[in-house]
Amino acid sequence: VGVADGKLFFITTKGAQRGRLMTVELANAGTDNWVELVPEQEGVLSSASFAGDKMILKYQKDAADQVYVYDRSGKKLNEIKLPTFGTVGISSDKDNNEVYYSFTSFTYPSARYSYDMATGESKQIGSTEIKNFNFDDYVTEQVFYTSKDGTKVPMFITYKKGLERNGKNPVYLYGYGGFNVSLPPSFSPNRLVWLENGGIYAQANLRGGSEYGEEWHQGGIKQNKLNVFNDFIAAAEYMIDQKWTSPDYLTIEGGSNGGLLVGATVNLRPDLFKVAIPRVGVMDMMRYHKFTIGWNWASDYGTSADSKEMAEYLLSYSPVHNIKNDGTKYPAIMVTTADHDDRVVPAHSFKYAAALQAANTGNAPKLIRIDSKAGHGAGKPMSKVIDEYTDIYSFIFQNLGIDPTKK
């Protein structure tokens, strides 16, 4: 965090898997002299910063940010009220009593605020304008559903107000579930075309992420990886059971580790989905560690070289090795990759798409989209992003029977 009053202020997960704020005298900084300033809370402590003579602590609770003002002795003074479930970025320093922060959510394009430490009031000082879209017509709610082993899993659902739960609404279910990465609320312009065509956007906070600290992460890695797929399946079943949708209207999507998620989930429950979009996915779990940076993922996946037991576990869900070939009807699938992806090499998607097309999995289309002169995704020019999502939504709309010209 920083140094003040002759002390180092820092966050540690030692003895607190969701994090706690500590101090130690610079002159005597051994671990035996650490002093707990703010103990572990229900939320995950994701950041702390000085703001004048006070401190701003940001927690992630149930996958959404909460922000509090503390004094330097560890006493909570105030909560910075946010518009709804969202994600916050903090800018503050020791020499200024005014704090600046950004806020975004599923139906909130990024907005900037100033917060006065003296009055406890926020003032919006900037926003992102999106023309021809009324965000007030849409709402986000958070639900908690039960996974296969009884674990409660949070999920955000965004939809148009007044939507009827008749089991016929198109749902776009997104997940990741790995590498200690959380999925907080975020804004993406590409989702607007989905929402304005009557779609529901659902984002499940699966195990393997950091939403509830290291225990949540550990619950979705190595020989717990099936928990992630079961969490995703349970999210789909929840949306169906609660009459948000039905299998004929349900699309799933995920990228990278999320592409693995989609590929594995489709093999486990092909009956649950109408469309699947596995993007730049890790599809060969037996050999992933032999390509480029793949060896670095062993901390989450384990490798087939670790042990016979680990190899058998990986083989049990590896997407390319578990495609059914008995006439089981699979959803329409568009695999995406890029010819210069050196993170998840395109061979994963090539092998998976070839295996899909060779197998007897019904008549729904099984396509692969190969982007040229592109990589894993980061830094992609906007023109390529637009082209990719145009193809993705066209594929989804075609297979769900949605005509975007008729709203």
Located regions from the model:
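Conserved beta-strand elements of the Class I
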Residues: 9, 171-173, 334
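Acidic helix/loop microenvironments that form the catalytic cleft of cell-wall polysaccharide enzymes
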Residues: 177-179, 257-258
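Peripheral, non-catalytic segments that deliver or gate enzyme domains
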Residues: 1-168, 179-197, 224, 237-241, ...
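The conserved beta1-alpha1 loop
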Residues: 175-177, 337
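A fold-wide structural signal in alpha/beta-hydrolase
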Residues: 171, 195-205, 367
